[in-house]
Amino acid sequence: MISLESQVLERHLPLFADKSVLLAGGVNDDFPQKIQSQCRSVKIWSWYFDYVNQIQGKSAVDFSVIFTGRADLIVYYWTKNKQEVQFQLMQLLANAPVGQEVLIIGENRSGVRSAEKMLAHFGDIGKIDSARRCGLYHFTLQKQPNFELENFWKTYRSPQLGELIVYSLPGVFSANELDVGTQLLLSTVKDNIRGDVLDLGCGAGVIGSMIKLKNPPAKVTMTDIHAMALASAERTLLENKLSGQVLASDVFSHVEGKFDLIISNPPFHDGIDTAYRAVRELISNAKWHLVPGGELRIVANAFLPYPDLLDEYFGGHKVLAQTNKFKVYSVIG
């Protein structure tokens, strides 16, 4: 199965013939495998570990914040996060030779129309197709942009975080300020947490870092699927002189061992749609990753049907804190 964006690209396969091709951005389907026989080589640069985990062994894939490879043709799948797009495209073009050919594809609702404005200063760009509610643009590089990783780092502090300084890169959830859901969840974190703690879907590492700050004996593991989140969490730990393990995992896919506390502000947005797969997987499998008597604690929008899921898999739940928009739920394994 291929996405709407890839269906549009399929109409232009002669542009791929006998070329080395790099697919980047929000690519998340089987299109790379479909075009392998027509291209000299196909490689993927993805920031999303759930996709990387799914296609590993089928396609050459690079899961990293920084990518230094080159290709005759770059195919960029536009994402809804404009800062993320700018980070990736500027990095790719700074590393590319003058004359580099780029195809940019995206759903209209994701904001792909802004591609022309973003790239006009660096070369020739024009729309070559419009179908499936998507726009396809062809770009030729004439002037390489400047790209400095350090310019993209953001930091912030918050009264609720004490001395903690949060470091984040574009595309990371709550990258510029402490979100209200995490704030409510942290209000339930005291200095009595011991043992092994898993911060699942860690973003910039705020929750796990605060637990470590308040509970130095706790052994904290942080996971996420997003490469930028993992890099941000690692730096947040490092700059605050805190210890912890940071690893890529699609929910529990690469998590080993059992935990005294699994804590999360789980994502419920997938691209530009709302999705519950990860949350259902988190709740349905958490029991197998908790020690006897271990706790799963999550914060969620009050309108989401998580209480039903928690009751289904744990036989009940407690509400530790709530506002008119958010609730913190707790269940014991």
UniProtKB/Swiss-Prot annotation:
Q: Which CDD domains match?
A: AdoMet_MTases
Instruction: Output the superkingdom of the source species.
Output: Bacteria
Reaction(s) catalyzed by this protein?
Answer: guanosine(1207) in 16S rRNA + S-adenosyl-L-methionine = N(2)-methylguanosine(1207) in 16S rRNA + S-adenosyl-L-homocysteine + H(+)
Segments forming a coiled coil: none
EC code: 2.1.1.172
Cysteine-cysteine disulfides? none
**Could you tell me which Gene3D superfamilies the record lists for this protein?**
Vaccinia Virus protein VP39
**Keyword Iron-sulfur applies:** no
Q: EC class of this enzyme?
A: transferase
**Subcellular location, record wording:** Cytoplasm
Q: Which Gene Ontology cellular-component terms appear in the entry?
A: cytoplasm
Q: Which Pfam families match?
A: MTS, MTS_N
Q: Per its record, what are the GO molecular function terms?
A: 16S rRNA (guanine(1207)-N(2))-methyltransferase activity; nucleic acid binding
What assembly does the database describe for this protein? Monomer.
Protein's job:
Specifically methylates the guanine in position 1207 of 16S rRNA in the 30S particle.
Task: Give the record's family classification.
Answer: Belongs to the methyltransferase superfamily. RsmC family.
The identity of this protein, by name, is Ribosomal RNA small subunit methyltransferase C
Gene name as annotated: rsmC
